[in-house]
C-alpha cells in the first residue's frame, strides 16, 4: 500500500546530496523521456532474428520469477488474496510474471503520474539537522514546483466475510523430489485495524505465546499430532487491517481438517483455562526490551522509526506516533492481562471471527517446466501473428535497446550528480574501545560504551579442535541449548524464565580468519545475552542451568528440533540463493570455508536431512556426541568473555561473571573421541544445484591474498565501482538479473555472485 524511498547519512552534505538525487528521481524520473527504461527495468519482447525465437526479458520480470518460485512467498501471497480479495492487498505489488507483459508503457506512466505526485507523498526527516532549513529547501527545490492534485489513495478496508474463505493452490517442486509431506496449510484471521494501539502489540505477544515460544501450546499440539515438520506463524501489523497466520510446513493437504480442529480446540482451551501468565509476561518483556533498546542492527534507527510510523500515519494523518510511543501501551497491557484481555482477543479474532481463511499449497512436480512451456507458447503464438515488417521492427527495437544499454552515460549527465570533496569527509575514525583484562585466569574484553543500562555479553568457547569430526553436530547443539527441558524447568518454563530476564539468550558459531593470514583462523561457539544490569546474575544462573542440566537425551524433542531446522534451513538456502552459492564456492578453498559451510550451508542441510530421515538409526550416536560436546566445549580453559557497557557499570558484570566462572569445570572430565555415524566429506568443485526456481544464482570465488595480492582498503572502492559499473551493466542491465554483487574482504575471500538471474553460462 506504499512505496518508500529512503536515504540516510552521517554526513550533512552527503545527506543533502542524497535528498537531491532521490527527490529528483522520484518526482522527475526519466521514464517520461525514454521508453527504453521501461523495457529494460520492466519488460520487453526480445528478438535477435526474424526467424525467432521471441522471448520476454526485463529486470523486474525476472525478479518476480524468483519471487514466485518460493513456496513460502506463494502461501503468504495466497493468504492475503484470500483475506482481502476486494482491496489492493489481494494483488502482488511486484507483479505476477504471467501478467507483467500485459502492462503497457502508457498505463505505467498514467499510474505513476497519478500516485507518485507530491500531493500524495509523506515526507519524514529524522536526525540532528536544521529541520526548518531542510524543509524550506525541499519546498523551494521541489514541492513548490507542483500544483496540488487531489488523489484518492485512501486504503479501503475489506468488508468482513459472512463465512470463512478457503483457497488451494500449487507450487513447483524440482524434478526427482518426492511430493510426500511437502504441502503447506495455513489458518488466517484478520485482527481489527492498525490504529488500535493495544491490539498492535497484543497480537505480537500472542504470536509468541501461541506459536513462536519454545513449547508454545498451539504449536506443541500440532507437532505432537504429526501435523507438519515445522509450525510457524506471523503477525502482519504494517497494513490497514492486520492479520495473524498459523502455518504448517511439510505436511499433507489431507490433514487440513485435523489441523484446523487442533488449533481451535487448543485456542478454546486457552480461553477457558486461561493463558499461562509467565508466557504472557515473557512475551511482553521481550517486546518491551526491544522497544526500549531500539537496536535495529545494521539499519539506521531513524529509518526504522519512520517505517513504523507508516503503520498508523498512512491510515490516519493525525496519528503518526501512536506505535513509536508505546510506554503507556505496555503498562496498559500488563493491567489488562489480569482481566482476561488476551483470552478475549483469541475468542473474538481467532475463534468467533468469520473474516478468516484456510489456505493450502501443494507441490506439483514439473510445474516450473509447465510454466516455462506456457510462456514460450504464448510468445510463439504472438510471434506467429506478426507480419514480416513487425518482426523486423522488433529485431530493430531489440538492437536499439542493446545499444542503449551499452552506451556510456554522457559526461554532462555524470557531472550533474552532486559529489563530496575529500575535505567534506571526516578523517577521524569513530573511537574503538577494546580493553583486555585478566579476570581470575579468563581473558575478558571490555568495550567501554554507553549502553543505557544494558549489558551486552558474549562468551566465546574455542571449538577449532573439534571441527574436523563434529562441525555439523556443533551447529545442531546451538539449536538445542535453551530449547530443551532442564532439571529444574520444562522447556516452556525455561523459555519464559529467559525472556523475563533477558533480551537475548542465544548460541551461535563464529569462524574468523586472522588478519593477513588467510590460512590461520579461530573458531568459537558463542553465547550472547542482552540483559539489564540488575538481572545479570540471574541470567548467568540460567546459563549455568542450561549448560549443566539440559536434557539432550530427550529423543522426542531432538527429533522435533532436527525436523524444524531441516525445514527452515532448506527454505533459507533456496530463498537466499546468492548467499548459498557464495558460501558453497568459498568452501572449496580452505578448511575454514569447509567447516563454515558444514555448519550453515548445503552440507549442514544434508546432515540434518540424513539424521531426520534415519533418526532411529542415528539418534543414540547423535545424543552421545552432543553430550560429549557439552563437556568438551563449555570449560573454563576454552572460554573468553566480551562485555559492552560503560566503564562505571563494568564492576557489576565482573562480579556476576566471576561467580559463574568459578562453577565452570576447568577442563573436560574425560577425553571425548566418539566416531560420528554421519560424516561430511570434501565437496567437489564447480557444482550446480537444481531447484524448482525459474532463475539462477551464479557465484565465483577465490582467495586473492593466497595468490600474493595483499588486502588494501581501496578494494572497498573497487567493490563499489564493479558492483555499480561493469557488473551492473553486464549482468543486470544487459543480462536481466535483478542484482549482482562482489566482495573483497581483508581475509582475501573474494567473490562475485548474481541474484535472480535468468542467465547461467553467460553470467559465469
Where do the PLM segments sit?
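M16 family metallopeptidases and their MPP-like homologs
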Residues: 1-28, 35-47, 73-98, 120-126, ...
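Hydrophobic, small-residue-rich alpha-helical packing segments that form membrane-like cores
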Residues: 45-120, 124-175, 179-181, 186
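Extended, regular secondary-structure scaffolds
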Residues: 110, 122, 131-152, 273, ...
Amino acid at each position: 500500500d506504499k512505496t518508500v524511498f529512503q536515504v540516510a547519512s552521517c554526513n550533512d552534505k552527503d545527506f543533502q546530496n542524497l535528498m537531491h538525487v532521490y527527490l529528483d528521481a522520484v518526482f522527475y524520473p526519466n521514464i517520461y523521456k525514454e521508453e527504453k527504461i521501461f523495457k529494460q527495468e520492466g519488460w520487453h519482447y526480445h528478438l535477435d532474428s526474424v526467424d525467432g525465437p521471441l522471448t520476454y526479458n526485463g529486470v523486474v520480470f525476472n525478479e518476480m520469477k524468483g519471487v514466485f518460485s518460493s513456496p513460502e512467498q506463494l502461501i503468504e501471497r495466497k493468504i492475503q488474496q484470500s483475506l482481502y480479495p476486494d482491496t489492493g492487498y489481494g494483488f502482488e505489488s511486484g507483479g505476477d510474471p504471467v501478467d507483467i507483459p500485459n502492462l503497457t508503457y502508457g498505463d505505467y506512466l498514467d499510474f505513476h503520474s497519478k500516485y507518485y505526485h507530491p500531493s500524495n507523498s509523506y515526507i519524514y526527516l529524522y536526525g540532528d539537522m536544521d529541520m526548518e532549513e531542510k524543509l524550506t529547501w525541499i519546498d523551494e527545490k521541489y514541492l513548490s514546483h507542483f500544483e496540488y492534485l487531489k488523489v484518492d489513495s485512501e486504503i479501503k478496508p475489506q468488508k468482513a466475510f459472512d463465512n470463512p474463505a478457503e483457497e488451494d493452490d500449487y507450487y513447483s517442486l524440482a524434478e526427482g523430489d518426492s511430493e510426500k509431506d511437502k504441502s503447506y496449510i495455513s489458518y488466517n484471521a484478520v485482527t481489527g485495524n492498525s490504529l488500535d494501539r493495544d491490539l498492535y502489540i497484543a497480537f505480537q505477544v500472542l504470536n509468541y505465546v501461541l506459536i513462536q515460544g519454545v513449547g508454545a501450546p498451539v504449536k506443541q499440539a500440532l507437532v505432537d499430532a504429526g501435523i507438519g515438520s515445522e509450525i510457524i506463524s506471523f503477525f502482519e501489523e504494517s497494513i490497514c487491517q492486520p492479520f495473524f497466520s498459523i502455518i504448517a510446513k511439510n505436511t499433507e493437504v489431507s490433514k487440513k481438517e485435523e489441523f484446523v480442529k487442533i488449533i481451535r480446540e487448543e485456542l478454546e482451551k486457552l480461553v477457558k483455562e486461561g493463558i499461562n501468565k509467565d508466557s504472557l509476561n515473557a512475551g511482553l518483556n521481550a517486546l518491551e526490551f526491544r522497544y526500549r533498546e531500539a537496536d535495529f542492527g545494521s539499519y539506521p534507527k531513524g529509518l526504522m522509526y519512520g517505517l513504523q510510523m507508516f503503520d498508523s500515519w498512512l491510515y490516519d494523518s493525525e496519528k503518526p506516533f501512536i506505535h513509536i510511543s508505546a510506554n503507556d501501551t505496555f503498562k496498559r497491557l500488563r493491567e489488562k492481562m489480569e482481566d482476561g484481555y488476551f483470552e478475549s482477543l483469541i475468542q473474538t479474532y481467532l475463534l468467533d471471527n468469520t473474516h478468516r481463511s484456510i489456505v493450502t499449497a501443494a507441490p506439483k512436480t514439473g510445474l516450473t517446466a509447465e510454466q516455462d512451456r506456457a510462456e514460450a507458447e504464448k510468445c510463439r503464438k504472438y510471434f506467429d501473428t506478426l507480419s514480416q515488417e513487425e518482426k523486423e521492427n522488433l529485431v530493430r527495437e531489440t538492437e536499439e535497446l542493446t545499444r542503449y544499454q551499452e552506451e556510456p552515460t554522457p559526461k554532462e549527465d555524470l557531472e550533474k550528480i552532486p559529489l563530496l570533496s575529500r575535505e567534506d569527509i571526516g578523517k577521524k575514525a569513530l573511537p574503538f574501545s577494546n580493553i583486555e583484562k585478566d579476570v581470575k585466569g579468563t581473558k575478558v574484553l571490555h568495550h567501554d560504551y554507553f549502553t543505557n543500562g544494558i549489558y551486552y555479553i558474549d562468551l566465546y568457547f574455542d571449538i577449532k579442535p573439534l571441527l574436523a569430526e563434529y562441525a555439523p553436530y556443533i551447529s545442531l547443539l546451538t539449536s538445542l541449548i535453551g530449547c530443551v527441558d532442564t532439571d529444574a524447568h520444562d522447556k516452556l518454563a525455561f523459555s519464559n524464565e529467559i525472556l523475563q530476564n533477558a533480551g537475548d539468550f542465544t548460541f551461535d558459531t563464529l569462524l574468523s580468519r586472522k588478519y593477513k593470514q588467510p590460512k590461520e583462523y579461530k573458531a568459537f561457539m558463542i553465547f550472547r545475552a542482552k540483559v539489564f544490569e540488575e538481572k545479570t546474575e540471574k541470567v548467568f544462573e540460567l546459563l549455568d542451568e542450561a549448560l549443566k542440566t539440559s536434557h539432550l537425551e530427550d529423543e522426542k524433542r531432538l527429533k522435533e528440533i532436527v525436523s524444524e531446522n531441516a525445514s527452515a534451513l532448506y527454505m533459507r538456502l533456496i530463498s537466499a540463493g546468492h548467499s548459498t552459492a557464495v558460501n558453497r564456492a568459498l568452501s572449496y578453498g580452505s578448511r575454514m570455508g569447509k567447516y563454515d559451510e558444514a555448519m550453515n550451508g548445503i552440507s549442514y542441510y544434508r546432515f540434518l536431512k540424513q539424521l531426520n530421515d534415519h533418526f532411529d538409526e542415528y539418534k543414540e550416536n547423535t545424543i552421545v556426541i552432543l553430550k560429549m560436546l557439552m563437556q568438551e566445549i563449555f570449560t573454563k580453559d576454552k572460554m573468553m568473555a566480551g562485555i559492552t557497557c560503560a566503564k562505571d557499570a563494568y564492576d557489576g558484570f565482573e562480579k556476576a561473571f566471576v561467580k559463574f566462572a568459578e562453577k565452570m569445570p576447568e577442563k573436560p572430565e574425560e577425553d571425548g573421541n566418539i566416531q560420528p555415524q554421519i560424516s561430511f566429506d570434501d565437496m567437489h568443485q564447480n557444482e550446480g544445484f537444481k531447484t524448482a526456481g525459474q532463475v539462477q544464482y551464479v557465484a565465483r570465488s577465490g582467495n586473492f591474498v593466497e595468490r600474493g595480492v595483499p588486502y588494501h582498503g581501496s578494494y572497498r572502492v573497487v567493490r563499489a565501482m564493479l558492483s555499480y559499473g561493469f557488473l551492473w551493466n553486464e549482468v543486470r542491465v544487459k543480462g536481466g538479473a535483478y542484482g549482482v554483487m562482489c566482495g573483497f574482504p581483508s581475509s582475501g575471500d573474494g567473490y562475485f555472485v548474481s541474484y535472480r538471474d535468468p542467465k547461467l553460462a553467460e553470467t559465469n
